Regions:
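P-loop NTPase nucleotide-binding core
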Residues: 18-19, 24-25, 31-135, 202
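Conserved Walker B catalytic segment
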Residues: 129-178, 186-190
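Conserved nucleotide-binding/hydrolysis micro-motifs of P-loop NTPases
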Residues: 27-28, 54-59, 176-181, 209-213
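Extended alpha-helical coiled-coil/bundle linker/stalk regions that scaffold oligomerization
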Residues: 171, 276-370
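The conserved phosphate-sensing helix
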Residues: 261-272
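Short regulatory helix/loop adjacent to the ATP-binding pocket of P-loop NTPases
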Residues: 180-200
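Pre-Walker A adenine-sensing motif
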Residues: 1-17
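Conserved small helical "lid"/interfacial subdomain of P-loop NTPases
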Residues: 198-249, 261
Length: 370
């Protein structure tokens, strides 16, 4: 069964025994899988509420955030508050506006209720009704950015377990690996294993189909020009080779390699967007753009922005011999020095680029900031 089908199967459990832990390499598309594929597959039966754990420091803050995100997503489904929310700033102002619209004399009551913070008073439920179809929809809580949480791990798992086991929310916890949880609980392994067993009922390793994901990115994203979009599509196989030539074997064997490259889709997408500058200036200058240039640019960009793995650790410092090891098609001669500088520091000079590729332009003909 595919990862997506496993997620769908779990979300259809009416009274989940525990949360599902979805793991996968940093940047490999776990969030894309949830926000695009799973949301699309469950749009008629479920509502996805995403909760970022970034910077959360205590249980009260987490509970408040869960409720806030629930209201932000589920309020439009519950009814007329949706229109008021569109005209107001924030949920509390929306509630006040909606109540006053129903009964102008209720303004003072609305103010009292707002002062109580309605998100802490009104109940949230694991099932809501779609006002258009009157069909029930399950609410799925998705916790992301586990690596960046700052709260006590015992409290973290306790809150997650409360919403899952006691309030019956289907719950997905997204993390790079189970090792993150073990690291959070490193000072008390016994407590960790007890809470993990109680909180997480299923672990699922995401093995992405990068060919399909790349196809979607190329088709759905708005690129700087139609001809550049066509250029990228024509070089889809090369881009996939740069990005994930080593992935299939690793994924099938579930290898945790000590040395290698990261498969970060955000960095790849930004790298393809950035390469438009190279594509544009070479085209304007009438200079041929060999495939090795695209390959080498993306390899250098990926290593600089998402790092490489050395000794099992993420490092951003690398040599070009590292690149030839992890990206066999990388050519030092294909990449200009100004491109290296631009990728690393953001400093760009069109004149220097044109000089490096053999084009002499008249002074003032090009703009350094272009």
């Amino acid at each position: 069964m595919s990862t997506l089908n496993e997620l769908i199967h779990y979300c259809n459990e009416y009274n989940p025994i525990g949360a599902l832990l979805l793991t996968g390499e940093w940047g490999c598309g776990k969030t894309y899988l949830i926000e695009k594929d799973l949301t699309r597959a469950l749009e008629k039966t479920h509502v996805i509420v995403k909760v970022s754990l970034f910077g959360i420091t205590d249980a009260n803050a987490l509970r408040s955030l869960i409720r806030q995100k629930w209201f932000e997503v589920c309020t439009p489904i519950l009814g007329q508050l949706h229109k008021a929310k569109e005209k107001s700033s924030g949920f509390l102002a929306a509630f006040n506006a909606a109540l006053h619209a129903v009964n102008p004399l209720a303004g003072s009551a609305a103010n009292v209720m707002v002062s109580m913070n309605m998100m802490d008073v009104l109940p949230i439920k694991a099932e809501v009704e779609d006002p258009k179809t009157l069909e029930k929809k399950r609410v799925v809580l998705v916790y992301d950015d586990l690596e960046r949480v700052k709260m006590d791990p015992v409290q973290l798992l306790g809150v997650i377990n409360d919403f899952c086991e006691n309030q019956n929310f289907n719950t997905i916890l997204v993390s790079e690996s189970d090792a993150v949880l073990r690291h959070l609980m490193k000072e008390d392994a016994t407590t960790y294993h007890m809470l993990r067993e109680k909180t997480i009922s299923q672990s699922l390793r995401y093995i992405p189909d990068f060919a399909e994901i790349l196809h979607s990115i190329l088709q759905e994203r708005i690129w700087p020009s139609d001809d550049y979009a066509e250029y990228l599509s024509e070089h889809k196989a090369l881009i996939l080779d740069v990005f994930a030539s080593d992935y299939d074997q690793r994924a099938k064997m579930l290898l945790a390699v000590e040395d290698g490259k990261y498969h970060n889709l955000r960095a790849l997408t930004k790298g393809m967007e950035s390469f438009f500058r190279i594509y544009y200036h070479t085209k304007e200058a009438g200079v041929a753009l060999p495939d090795s240039h695209l390959y080498s640019f993306l390899a250098y960009y990926l290593a600089a922005k998402s790092g490489i793995r050395k000794g099992g650790e993420l490092v951003l410092e690398f040599t070009e011999s590292d690149l030839t090891q992890f990206y066999p098609g990388f050519s030092q001669d294909a990449l200009t020095n100004i491109e290296r500088e631009w990728i690393k520091t953001g400093i760009w000079d069109t004149n220097l680029f044109l000089e490096e590729i053999g084009v002499r332009s008249e002074a003032g003909q090009t703009d350094k900031n272009n």
